[in-house]
Design a protein with these regions (language model features):
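Conserved NAD+-utilizing ADP-ribose enzyme module
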Residues: 1-126
Length: 126
């Protein structure tokens, strides 16, 4: 499968499939991608929650930024550092994660849920 077909297939997949891909790919690559700007990490405030947006690779973060958030730049974070930062956010119930958003739909998960899934996958492969 060439990269364009792979990209399109994942970009157009349902949110749950993209979430599962995010977990396995981020752990395999040992990194996650977020968007950042001069004020810090890009967030979306929806329904009283602050959502951090994350992707499994730069190409998807770039595509989202190009389409919806031109002032934000993709930044890579080591998976272990990301997990540590998630642990620091555990008590803040207003923070959630939008995992692999594409503009059409998104998988929203609590910090605890995301950290649990990433930790489980890390334990499985390490």
């Amino acid at each position: 499968m060439n990269n364009d077909k792979r990209f399109e297939g994942l970009w157009n997949a349902i949110a749950e499939k993209r979430y599962k891909h995010f977990i396995t790919y981020a752990v395999d690559q040992e990194s996650v991608w977020l968007l950042a700007n001069k004020d810090g990490f890009a967030t979306m405030d929806v329904d009283g929650y602050i959502h951090l947006l994350v992707w499994p690779s730069k190409e998807f973060a770039d595509a989202y930024s190009d389409a919806y958030s031109k002032e934000d730049t993709p930044v890579e974070m080591d998976i272990h550092e990301f997990c540590e930062r998630c642990e620091e956010l555990m008590d803040d119930k207003e923070i959630r994660f939008m995992v692999f958003p594409t503009g059409k739909d998104v998988w929203i998960v609590s910090t605890e849920g995301l950290l649990s899934d990433l930790t489980e996958e890390l334990e499985r492969v390490e």
